[in-house]
Amino acid sequence: MKFKLKDPGSAITHGIAFLLAAVGAAPLLIRSSEWSDHIHIVALGVFILTMMLLYAASTLYHSVDSTAKVNRRLKKLDHMMIFVMIAGSYTPVCLIVLHNKIGYVLCALVWATAILGIVFKAFWVTCPKWISSVLYIGMGWLCVLAFMPIIHALPKAGFGWLLAGGIIYTIGGVIYALKLPIFNAKHKNFGSHEIFHVFIMLGSACHFIVMYCFVANMPI
């Protein structure tokens, strides 16, 4: 029996993203292990692991077309991992860049929000896309609570990449919410959802650059 991808465009884009994240994991962890403390390798390990989990879950969901029950569970996992990756992206910023009471409180807040998001998706994975986008974008911008400390702690270039990633993620979330039906009608395997995937990949790339080039080198 020939295997056929359920959503080829979505499966391929995030399959590529998973491979890129896996390739980037080793150099990131090697660089973070140069410090004598364990905070660098733990925080950056959480960052890259949660990124890989998101892309693995997304690739699996968009690749496999099984029973309605299995598909629903895979969809829940896919959506839940978005909250997990957002929290994972915050972790190095909170524990390394800030490394103070503000950072610890923000880290606890984003992970608590991630848990609430996971519970929400467990019970209402079919909620309107705009609700999902509001939740993801809102969680992503919790950093405004510590905006000035982050600006002062990161080099200008590092903050620029961090901000660029946040903006790109936000644009992707808006595209996800709008769905762009006219575009979808013209491109069967590469519609608004796949464009959303590309924006998520670009946002991840920006944040990987921040972590590898700036955060991994920061003393605490």
Residue ranges and their predicted role:
Residues 1-220:
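Multi-pass alpha-helical transmembrane bundles in non-GPCR membrane proteins
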